[in-house]
Amino acid sequence: MSIKEHDCVVLTADLPKEGLKAGDVGTVVHIHGDGVAYEVEFMTFAGKTIAVATVEASAVRPVGERDVSHVRELQSA
């Protein structure tokens, strides 16, 4: 399944610099090349953007039909 702009994706690896963890969900806002990397926006459930990160294709996957949301509190920097 290919990932397109505006798709929800799940991190498969931590991004410590951005304070993000595997399992966090974001929205693709730009595709680099032929999908070698994605610009992904991560937000709180309240709608506040917490990070926009360039993520390699190997570090994200599409949201699946059987995925369930899970809440974690964002740690302060």
Which residues does each predicted region cover?
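Extended, low-polarity transmembrane helix blocks
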Residues: 75-76
